[in-house]
Structures are given as structure tokens and as C-alpha cells.
Amino acid sequence: MASRAGPRATGTDGSDYQHRERVASHYQMSVALKSEIKKLNIAHAVVWFLVAAQVLVSQLNLVSHKVVASPYQWEYTYLLSIIPTVFSFMALPKNNISYLVISMISGGLFCIGPILYGGMEMFPVAQQLYRHGKAYRFIFGFSAVSIMYLVLIISVQVHGWQIYYSKKLLDAWFTNTQDKKKK
């Protein structure tokens, strides 16, 4: 705000920022963590959709089993992993602590559990592929065990980060509620 003639008005040169209020760190952290969790939820939804598509195509016999292999047992239970993601999406808009806790617990049960079982279930087939170079199940011409191990690796990372960021977000929310109780 400069005048046509004369000096600039005091307080308009940008030096008046020190008296302004700042956003508390736990609110900043909450926004950042919510953003990360939303990205991870979307990544999980993509992985879940791919697994669901394979199970659906196989069960409905839409294509030959030579093109898309029949699913492993762990893939059926992994389909329940959409439940934690739904609870996570429901928890974020209103900072609902109980939904976030349900999401974390069910994430361990429905996400990490089937992934660990799947790694053990497919290990003999992967070992046979590595030692002898023979694969008996294929997905679009690629070894099914190789593709599903790739899915497992991606899923472990996505779910691990989901649980980690959810715990940090829960801590940020508890900091906020503890501050309110003190006042």
C-alpha cells in the first residue's frame, strides 16, 4: 500500500508477521498424515481391485485358466482387506478415533495376516520356479507366483505404512484431545 507521494504506510512492509498466530504443530501433522493415509488407501484400493479382478475372472470362468491362473487361497481372505480401508476413509473427515483404531486392528488381521499366509503358501512354488525354472500357473503369460509375490511386496509396504501413519495420526489426535482437557 504505497501512496503516490511520500513514504510507505507503516506495517505494510511485511514486518508485521511476528504478532500473528501460528497453526499448532499437531494440526499441521494431522493434515499431512491424513494426506499420506489417503494416498495409501488409494494405492491399497488399486491393489485390492487387481486381486479382486483376478478372483472374479477366475471364478466366473471369463477366460481360460491358461490365461489367468486360479487364485491362491490367501487371495480370498485378502479380499476382506477392503474393510480397514473403508474404516480409514470414514475416520479421516471427522477425526474419528474409534474408526481409526478399528482400521488399524483390522488392517493387521485382514491385510497383514493373509499376506503372511500367502508368502508361506506360495513359497514352495517360488522355490520350484527358482531352482528348476518351471512354472505351472500363469497370468497373461507370466509366472503367477512371480506376479503374486510382486503384489505381496507392494501390499506389505502399503499396509505397513498405513498402520505406521495411522499410529502417528492417532498420537497427533490424542495430543489435541489432551490439550483440550488441560484447558
From Swiss-Prot:
It is found in: Endoplasmic reticulum membrane. InterPro entries: Jagunal (IPR009787). GO terms for cellular component: endoplasmic reticulum; endoplasmic reticulum membrane. It is a multi-pass membrane protein. The keyword Phosphoprotein does not apply. Residues 61-71, 121-137 are lumenal. Residues 1-39, 93-99, 159-183 are cytoplasmic. One of its GO terms (biological process) is protein transport. Keywords: Endoplasmic reticulum, Immunity, Membrane, Protein transport, Transmembrane, Transmembrane helix, Transport. The chain crosses the membrane at residues 40-60, 72-92, 100-120, 138-158. Its main location: endoplasmic reticulum. Belongs to the jagunal family. Endoplasmic reticulum transmembrane protein involved in vesicle-mediated transport, which is required for neutrophil function. This is Protein jagunal homolog 1-B. It comes from Danio rerio.
